[in-house]
Every structure is written in structure tokens, then in C-alpha cells.
A protein has these predicted regions:
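Flexible "cap/lid" subdomain of the alpha/beta-hydrolase fold that forms the substrate-access gate
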Residues: 3-8, 18, 29, 65-101, ...
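Signature tryptophan residues that serve as conserved aromatic anchors
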Residues: 36, 40-43, 105, 111, ...
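A short loop-to-beta-strand scaffold at the N-terminal edge of the catalytic core in hydrolase folds
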Residues: 14-23
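Catalytic active-site module of serine/aspartate enzymes centered on a nucleophile-bearing elbow/loop
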Residues: 288-321
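Conserved beta-strand scaffold positions in the cores of enzyme catalytic domains, especially
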Residues: 9-11, 57-59, 290-293
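Conserved HGGG/HGGXW glycine-rich cap/lid loop of the alpha/beta-hydrolase fold
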Residues: 22-69, 281
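Basic/polar N-terminal segments that are highly enriched at the extreme N-terminus
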Residues: 1-12, 319-321
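Hydrophobic residues on the short alpha-helix immediately C-terminal to a glycine-rich phosphate/catalytic loop
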Residues: 46, 113, 312-316
Length: 321
């Protein structure tokens, strides 16, 4: 239903990019940020319920993705530019403030937007990726040695794009399956059993069937979106991970003061990256409304458990209204 239903897209100019943004509904502004490798379509089950609940919903393809522009330089995707894009959507739509919900890489952008734009971003919710001040350990975890780790692999220029652009459908299915609820929990982490010399598609298991959460039509739409620019723009996001701290020294030790919430699937392998992931929420968020773990979901909770995820989003938005 998500594809066949005609969405209202607007093209929004930001500093250095043109974003294609689904904009629907009337009311307070809520911006939804996808991550890697995704596009606006990740939120296909959430848009209508949020509109029905009385919100204006803006869902961009973030820069480098889908119908948005794909700037050429690695530095075009640094954290300052990614967060500025979000506030530029607010300004273009004529709002003073907005509420923000991110998923995966969209969480890193959301947490940092909340810190850098605290006067316009009034509430922030993350799905899947906890609040982390990214350090070199994200790229080179201690003890990694010569084992494969996707974030380190993604730092290599051209190699990654060549591998993933060769067969876009296979690349997407491998990622969706490896992090999804159809593969056993921990599947994503099996990449660490492979040597650093292989590519991502060799380090992850061949994808099995995807459940009803990603139909053949869904997959075809994703392939169409990624065929526009390939994986260069999306992978450039990862090439900016090492620079986040240097570009935001004023955020060192700063935690989120706005109302905030976090939810993740119980089987999301991202939570295995850091057994201590709850600590920043418990230690430093000034107004954490809730932290929920959804059974039966892995990484793609918006589509694996759409009704439950939407309910958590609406619960948060209604609490902070």
C-alpha cells in the first residue's frame, strides 16, 4: 500500500543539498530521519497515523539518498551539514520549532541536532542507535586486529561503492536480512569471523527470504531509489564518523536537555556494540520519558512491528506536546 499511495513530495533547498521530503498533514512539525541503507520509505507505516493524530510530518530522503541530491565530496556529509539539513527543513516549512525522531544513522543526526539546535528542536526520540559520543573505537573497536568490521571497511574510498553498486538488490537484501528479524539474533556480528580482506557481502550470510515486512514491491522501490546515486553518498556518511568529535568540540560531555525517548528491537544487533548502551540515558538525559525494548523486532522495528512502533512514537509526541 505504501508505494501505490501517492505521497506529497516537496523539494527543499538546504546549504549544499536539495532534499526530497514527504510533507503531509497539518499541526506541529515532526521530522522523521531514516538511516543506512534506507530512504523516506522506511517510515511508510508511520506517516498516515501521525497525520491522523494531528501532526505535520516531514520525511526526507537525507542527502545522498533517493530523490535528494548526492553531493560529491566526503566532507559534504559531515555532522554539521547533516544536522543543518534538518533545521533547514523546519525553516523551509515556516516553523519555529519541531520534534524529531531518528532511526539508525538518523539517530546520530537526531541526537546531534537536538544538541546543536536546542532552541528549535523541542523533543527527540531515537530508534535503534543509542546516544553515543562517537569515538575512534566505533571505526576500530579494541582488539579488532585483522577481522572484518563494516565501519572500518566503509572508510576505504571507491572499494565499497564498487562492491555494493554491482548488484543493488543483493546489497540491500543482504543488509535488510542481516539486521532483520528473519535471521537469527547475532547474525550481523558474524562478520567479525571473517578477515578484513573480504568485502561486506562476503562477510555477511547470503540473504534468506525476507518476511512480510519487506515485500517484493518494497524491495523494487528501494532498488529504484538506490539506482539513482548508488552507495557513494550513503557510505560517505560513515567516512565522517571519525570527524564528529573534532567538528563538535562544544558538545563534549553535553547531554540532551529536551524531552527524549528511546526504543529498539529486542533482537537488534546494534545493541550488542556496547553492552553499556543504557548508561548515557540513565546518567545524563535531563528528561528521558521512556526507554522501551520491543519483543519480536530486530533492527527495522518500524516495519517489523509497525503498530507497536507507531504507538510508541505517538505516545512520546503526545507526552511532549
Amino acid at each position: 500500500s505504501g508505494i501505490l499511495q501517492q505521497r506529497h513530495f516537496e523539494m527543499i533547498e538546504t546549504d549544499g543539498a536539495t532534499l526530497r521530503v514527504v510533507v503531509e498533514g497539518e499541526g506541529p512539525l515532526v521530522i522523521l530521519l531514516h538511516g543506512w541503507p534506507q530512504c523516506w520509505y522506511l517510515w511508510r507505516h508511520q506517516i498516515d497515523p501521525l497525520v491522523a493524530a494531528g501532526y505535520r510530518v516531514a520525511v526526507p530522503d537525507q542527502r545522498g539518498y533517493g530523490g535528494s541530491s548526492c553531493p560529491p565530496e566526503v566532507s559534504d556529509y559531515d555532522i554539521r551539514k547533516l544536522t543543518a539539513d534538518v533545521d533547514a527543513i523546519r525553516a523551509a516549512l515556516g516553523y519555529d520549532t519541531f520534534q524529531l525522531i531518528g532511526h539508525d544513522w538518523g539517530c546520530l543526526v537526531a541526537w546531534n541536532t537536538a544538541l546543536l539546535y536546542e532552541h528549535t528542536c523541542t523533543a527527540v526520540m531515537g530508534l535503534s542507535v543509542p546516544f553515543w559520543r562517537i569515538s575512534e573505537a566505533a571505526v576500530n573497536p579494541p582488539g579488532l586486529d585483522d577481522r572484518f568490521w563494516y565501519i572500518r571497511y566503509f572508510q576505504q574510498p571507491d572499494v565499497v561503492e564498487r562492491e555494493l553498486d554491482r548488484d543493488i538488490e543483493r546489497s540491500l537484501r543482504t543488509n535488510f536480512y542481516g539486521l532483520g528479524s528473519d535471521s537469527p539474533p547475532g547474525t550481523w556480528m558474524t562478520q567479525l569471523e571473517h578477515p578484513a580482506s573480504v568485502g561486506l557481502l562476503d562477510a555477511l550470510p547470503a540473504p534468506g527470504e525476507l518476511g512480510a515486512w519487506t515485500t517484493k514491491e518494497d524491495l523494487a522501490y528501494y532498488v529504484e531509489q538506490f539506482s539513482r546515486h548508488g552507495f557513494r553518498g550513503p557510505t560517505n556518511w560513515y567516512r565522517n564518523l571519525p570527524s564528529i568529535n573534532a567538528l563538535t568540540p562544544e558538545l563534549e560531555g553535553k547531554l540532551i536537555s529536551q524531552p527524549a525517548a528511546f526504543a529498539a528491537g529486542a533482537d537488534d544487533d546494534v545493541l550488542l556494540y556496547d553492552p553499556d548502551w543504557r548508561a548515557p540515558f540513565e546518567a545524563g538525559f535531563r528528561d528521558l520519558r521512556f526507554l522501551e525494548i520491543l519483543d519480536g523486532a530486530a533492527h527495522w522495528l518500524q516495519v517489523e512491528k509497525p503498530a507497536e512502533t507507531t504507538a510508541l512514537m505517538l505516545r512520546f509526541l503526545s507526552e511532549v506536546a
